Amino acid sequence: GKTTILRRWRQDKALKNAPVIVHDLSEFGLDAELLADEDSPPTPGCLKNRVAALHGCHAREKLHESVANVLQEISKLDPEPDLVLCESTGAALPWPLICALTQDKRFYIRHFIVTVDALNLHRDFADGDVLTGATSCSEDIALRRASEVLAEQILFASVIIITKIDTIPDSAVNAQAKALQKLQPNATIALSAHAGVLLPQLDATLAPKLNVLKSRAEQFGLTNESATARSVDSLVIRDPRPFHPERLYE
C-alpha cells in the first residue's frame, strides 16, 4: 500500500531527510509511528524529527490550522528540504487537503498521487467499472461509499499508482488501467508490485495547476466538504502475536 511505497521512497538518499506529513483518520497515528524513528515517536499536530503526525482532531476540524503550523516548522529546517512528502488516509476527501497544503505560498503540489489496491479494485469494484458506471455498484453501503470516495480522489489525481498488481491477472490490470484513465485522462498511470515505483520515475509528469483543481472542485460542488469522508469509523486491534487473518476473523 501507500505506506510501504513511502517507506521505500525514503530509503533513497535524496529523500532520506525529506519531512513527512501523515494525515491519518485513526486516533492513534499508526502510519506516523511506522515512518518515525523507533526512538522518537511522533507528537500529534507537531513536526518531530521531520515527521508530522496529523491524526484525530488534527486530521479533521483542525486540519487547516495544524498543516499551517507544520509548514511553518518545516520552513525553519536547516538545511532547507527540497520537497515534503505527505501521506493521507484512504478516507480523505482531496480538496480540503489540497487547500490546507497550499495555504502557504512557499509550497506547491508537485504530484497528487492516488494509490489503488489492484486486488480490492478487482474483487469489489469490477476492475474499476463500478467507478465509471459501466457496472452497477454493490448494495453494500460501505462499498458504495468507498467507491464514491475513491472516484473523488481520482478526480484530482495527477498520478495513479495501481499497487499489488502481482495479485491479479494481467488482463485485469489492463482493464483497471483503462477504467482509471477513463476517469482521469490527464493522470499518469503507474503499475507497482512490492512498492516497485520510485518517485524519480514520475519526474516527467507535470505538476497539477491549483486553479484547475479549484475549478474542478467548484464544478462538482466539493468546495465545502470536511477533510475526511463522513460516517467512516476506524478500529485499531493490538496484539503482540504475529498477524494472521484467521485470528482477525475470529
Describe each model-derived feature in a short phrase.
Residues T3-E148:
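Nucleotide-state-sensitive switch-loop elements of NTP-binding domains
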Residues T135-E250:
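C-terminal accessory "lid"/substrate-recognition subdomains
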